[in-house]
Amino acid sequence: MIEPLLCGIVLGLIPVTLLGLFVDAWNQYRRDTVLGDW
């Protein structure tokens, strides 16, 4: 039996972690693209 609090923390961290990784990768891609254009 998983505690509701622990379950809520896990379900809350997963989207935040994925969003953080996506934003970091997008920023790196954008930075590389800008440097390539110049």
Curated annotation (Swiss-Prot):
GO terms for cellular component: cytochrome b6f complex; plasma membrane-derived thylakoid membrane. SUPFAM superfamilies: PetG subunit of the cytochrome b6f complex. It holds the Pfam family PetG. It is found in: Cellular thylakoid membrane. Its main location: membrane. The chain crosses the membrane at residues 5-25. It is a single-pass membrane protein. Component of the cytochrome b6-f complex, which mediates electron transfer between photosystem II (PSII) and photosystem I (PSI), cyclic electron flow around PSI, and state transitions. PetG is required for either the stability or assembly of the cytochrome b6-f complex. The 4 large subunits of the cytochrome b6-f complex are cytochrome b6, subunit IV (17 kDa polypeptide, PetD), cytochrome f and the Rieske protein, while the 4 small subunits are PetG, PetL, PetM and PetN. The complex functions as a dimer. Belongs to the PetG family. This is Cytochrome b6-f complex subunit 5.
